[in-house]
């Protein structure tokens, strides 16, 4: 395709601001989606965990044909823990669509990804979404975004950004919040007008950098990236240059383009287009594919350093091997090595013993997604509690700090301020917003935030919004942070849990187990309401005598136990 008719754009948004919904509507209204896919909501979230958590973890590519233009859209993760995905995506596009909620305005993750976009010199198009909500305040949000851009050091050109107002769920967009068009046409037209065509030479020798990887059982590894020069056809011979500069010869089997959500085989792809390449084994992210006669590798893509680590090890509890299919250290090691191929922000090192592996990532969420993925794939493993990664600078110890933005009702302010004080956080700003809510901004050490989210929801009765993003490494704060106020209930006997015992124990705290589950001696079965640990017997049955007949029991009602 002629590069003048090509547009490459990435969508940036905070978690749950409607990014994937917006892409769905663009696909439907441009006529790119066929009927069978129209019933599925959030089509771009293809992974089970993405649909359940309501977040995007992996960057997706899709293409829309609009009038005589072809628009390549890349959906980026909104969470800073997946920052390495964002980094690579931005190397493939000429502009970004910044999507902001019309109620909450820009959030920390918006700040994180926008900063990355400005560093790459990209000009944003601002989309203020959810303007149909009764509490929407689009003009306030616009001021907040302008202030954010200014704080991030945007150039005059970047500050002169275009604004579109939208209601993605209803499939409407317009130039004014109270004058939306019948469909998404204003947004699609804006993309074709304002986004520059790729600055590439289609007659130069072929060159392409791998920005993402996929695989399937038929063709093996699939390399995804943007062609930065020349053109490519199936069966072309190329030279692969890795980030260390080592060269090897290879042959391309297929060239796949995008049409909607489908990958379609193409006879030729030219510079500026985002394509998938198959047939080359052992591809890695950052590898450059070059014309054999003109070998000029592109600079390797940079990735943020990990900040949190956990130990993965073989499950050595008395119940080992009962639930999982893959239980040995060899299974765990192979799976982690497989994950390293496409999860480039992950680090895996040997642990203190042969069956332990130290796994480091960008944050709690990054590692929890990996653990949950492995659990669903039938891996059985034990994990340690998360530890932050500290650095030595000269003779000083530095630790990671995060910006934490908390949006709560005013009556919860005292409890939150007290708890953040215990976690060694410093208050940076406090703004009272409309409807009796307030926004607090803290600078907190990462170790103080581990395990805080569930407690935060309890303190705010589920009405608070907590977001955090890595900011910098700074001087470590002295002293330990007490992350757990409660003691635990520990089983002093092995056996099966019984409702009678649990009914009497639930007054002492929250249970982790329900009725009829096998437990072992020493297993933690609940949270104690006080700060000391309590040995308990969850297997105790009711003593039956002639005086106390089984039929005269009171009705035992168990409070639902905490499930992980």
Where would I find each of the regions flagged by the language model?
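P-loop NTPase switch module centered on the Walker A-proximal segment
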Residues: 1-100, 104-106, 144, 213-216
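Canonical P-loop GTPase G-domain recognition
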Residues: 123, 133-193
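Conserved P-loop NTPase nucleotide-binding/switch module
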Residues: 86-100, 105-149
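Accessory interaction regions appended to the cores of large information-processing enzymes
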Residues: 142, 160-162, 182, 189-193, ...
